[in-house]
């Protein structure tokens, strides 16, 4: 049995959590707290890195104290302390990294520097039915849209990706276009509930292959964003009031269609019977319902991260750290820094005596 304190400050959510992993692989979230900066950044239409870093410094100490007290543990009783160290906003990442390394050194605990995307992949382990590899992961968030095959030995292979905007980024930009505010995902979902998703025909962006045809698993959302812009411009020439509900529903539907169709095709083509969906956009109701229904029709078992752990949180970072501890991974060097970008398939390099950054 292992227990960890986990910290997350990669973007605009300050978070801390304490988790415990049982011998049979079950993970208990003993305490989890998040301090969101959404309202403050909404004034600017997006995340302001300097503001995010300052708010993390203010919020994180109180969050750590709260989760440790709620979990009924002391830092000295934990097996390790974990923090996100890549990818993300460099200044924001430093807050969790420095805090985690300092606490680990003071209490003589191992430190685990976790890849943020590995945390998202581990978030499905916080549900009722932990997944056993092999399975295909659709990671769909504000910064990433990727299809990742997780092998039985834990190895990860990327089979599909977005070549421009991530799905979550497209939601934010279209929400801004429609005057719906930030963050875009929840704003569009709320307005789309009463809309006609078939009113506007929008493109399902595809990526051309050099020899002809299209890549079956890759994504492109920039063309969809442009199509929405042109549709709105045309409507404004003919009406004083935009049909916001229909526009939002049509956009939301085409994003869901693209993600579901290409993900399930990828799983079927690779003979994978399990598909896991994680990331902030995985909280979207239309996408969740469509993925579950169509997966069932095609005989592919679909698991989705619990709603509470779809968006950025520390529990998912703790889950990833616990899985590393279960694999007897080495700890992260106290000399390690942070990196705004780092490939997920090189996450093992974070657990070596010589840090990659």
From Swiss-Prot:
Chain segments annotated as transmembrane: none
Superkingdom of the source species: Bacteria
Annotated GO biological process: tRNA threonylcarbamoyladenosine modification
Subcellular location: Cytoplasm
Catalytic reaction(s) noted: L-threonylcarbamoyladenylate + adenosine(37) in tRNA = N(6)-L-threonylcarbamoyladenosine(37) in tRNA + AMP + H(+)
CDD domains registered for this protein in UniProt: ASKHA_NBD_TsaD_bac
One annotated Gene Ontology cellular component of this protein: cytoplasm
GO molecular function, one term: N(6)-L-threonylcarbamoyladenine synthase activity
Cofactor note as given: Binds 1 Fe(2+) ion per subunit.
Chain residues that bind Fe cation: 116, 120, 312
Biological role: Required for the formation of a threonylcarbamoyl group on adenosine at position 37 (t(6)A37) in tRNAs that read codons beginning with adenine. Is involved in the transfer of the threonylcarbamoyl moiety of threonylcarbamoyl-AMP (TC-AMP) to the N6 group of A37, together with TsaE and TsaB. TsaD likely plays a direct catalytic role in this reaction.
Family per similarity comment: Belongs to the KAE1 / TsaD family.
Full protein name: tRNA N6-adenosine threonylcarbamoyltransferase
């Amino acid at each position: 049995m292992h227990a960890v304190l986990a910290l997350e400050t990669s973007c605009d959510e300050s978070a801390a959590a304490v988790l415990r992993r049982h011998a049979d692989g079950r993970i208990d979230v003993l305490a989890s707290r998040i301090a969101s900066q959404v309202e403050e950044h909404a004034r600017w239409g997006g995340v302001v890195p300097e503001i995010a870093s300052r708010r993390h410094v203010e919020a994180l100490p109180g969050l750590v104290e709260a989760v440790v007290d709620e979990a009924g543990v002391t830092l000295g009783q934990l097996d390790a302390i974990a923090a996100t160290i890549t990818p993300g906003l460099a200044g924001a990442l430093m807050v969790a990294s420095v805090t985690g390394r300092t606490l680990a050194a003071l209490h003589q605990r191992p430190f685990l520097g976790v890849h943020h995307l590995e945390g998202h992949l581990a978030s499905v382990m916080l549900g009722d039915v932990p997944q056993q590899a092999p399975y295909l992961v659709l990671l769909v968030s504000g910064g990433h849209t990727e299809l990742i095959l997780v092998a039985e030995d834990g190895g990860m292979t990327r089979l599909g990706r977005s070549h421009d905007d991530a799905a979550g980024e497209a939601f934010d930009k279209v929400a801004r276009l429609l005057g719906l505010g930030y963050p875009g995902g929840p704003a569009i979902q709320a307005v789309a509930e009463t809309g006609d998703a078939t009113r506007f025909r929008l493109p399902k962006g595809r990526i051309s292959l050099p020899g002809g045809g299209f890549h079956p698993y890759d994504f492109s959302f920039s063309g969809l964003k442009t199509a929405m812009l042109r549709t709105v411009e045309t409507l404004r020439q003919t009406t004083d009031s935009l049909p916001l509900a229909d526009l939002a529903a049509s956009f939301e539907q085409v994003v869901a269609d693209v993600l579901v169709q290409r993900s399930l095709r990828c799983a079927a083509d690779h003979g994978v019977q399990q598909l896991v969906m994680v990331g902030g956009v995985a909280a979207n109701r239309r996408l969740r319902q469509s993925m579950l229904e169509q997966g069932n029709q095609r005989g592919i078992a679909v698991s989705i991260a619990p709603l509470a752990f779809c968006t950025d949180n520390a529990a998912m970072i703790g889950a990833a750290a616990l899985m590393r501890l279960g694999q007897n991974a080495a700890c992260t060097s106290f000399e390690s820094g942070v990196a705004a970008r780092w490939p997920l398939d090189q996450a093992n390099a974070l657990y070596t005596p010589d840090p990659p950054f």
